[in-house]
Amino acid sequence: MTHNLASIIAGRYITNEHLVSSFQTLNKEIFNVLEAGKSVNNLPIYRVDFGTGCYKILLWSQMHGNESTTTKAVLDLLDYIQMNDKQDWLSKFTFCFIPILNPDGAEAYTRVNANGIDLNRDSKDLSQPESLVLRHVFEDFKPNLALNMHDQRTIFGVGAENKPATLSFLAPSFNETRDINETRLFAMQLISCMAASLASEIPGQVGRFDDSFNINCIGDMFTYLKVPTILFEAGHYPSDYEREETRKLVFKSLVVLLDSLLTKSYQKFTYEIYQDIPENEKTFVDVLIKNYETSNDFFKNRVGLPVFFKETLVNGRIEFLPTIDFE
């Protein structure tokens, strides 16, 4: 599996400018790049349509502007499709991909949009133009499957394994009691298939997100509307703060998902297999300083100083600035 875009689309800071560069490499006979709408700051929100099949897949990334790993993987997937002439996918599926839903947040490297709103808490109110763009696309496209692409912080680990949650998934709930219906079970089966494919490559590093119900979250809303939805959370791979290794694993997961839809291999996976994926938990710091000396009463009785890297935009690059935080 090649990643030809890795040389031109890399790092953590990914904006519309990078999208436009990558779009120039796309085969116009396969991909149709459109403008789905505008952001608060009037930046274009792009969508990429391709495929002619009856099964429709909607994907969006960078709903949170500072979560760019999955965007890189999505661009890798587009490149892979044209480089490998994936007619089996193109004839079976119709795709609508929104690589950056929150271009203002991407440019400012913030989770929220230009109005300071978390778009993943706006699925009921639809108070923001970006939320309306996604909802209009959803209602017009009428997907059979929705893929909600995010990043998670380096602090997340998997269960009691003492390993980072390099990739986590969720089949969102559709009600407060977290019941299982056909819609949600289908998402669970696809997730289980992807998790199984990653087991040998990153053993103990695939997690399951908490499934508490919140109708304001887009995945919960779409599942409530009876569209199977899968949350992807790209996390930390050891010594990979630029998330280039994680990018490859997200890409691989998408390939496995699409192949499993073709072959129906997901059908052998059960609810129990999904539940066996351990939940991710906040278990890590970036650096733990021990055996230090200080006269400060607040610090001297601590076992260690927990250091977290604050991702900070500096001159078009993300720098990781150390901060001490006991929260």
Model-derived regions, located:
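C-terminal accessory segments enriched in acidic
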Residues: 1-19, 141, 170-178, 182-327
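Short beta-strand-to-loop junctions in surface cap/lid or active-site-entrance loops
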Residues: 46-54
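Active-site/substrate-binding loop(s) of hydrolase catalytic cores
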Residues: 54-56, 68-204
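Short glycine-biased active-site loop of nucleotidyltransferases that positions the nucleotide triphosphate
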Residues: 49, 108-111, 220-223
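Short hydrophobic beta-strand that contains or immediately precedes a catalytic carboxylate
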Residues: 58-61
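Conserved beta-strand scaffold positions in the cores of enzyme catalytic domains, especially
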Residues: 33, 47, 97, 146, ...
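Short glycine- and acidic-rich boundary segments immediately preceding or forming the N-terminal edge
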Residues: 1-45
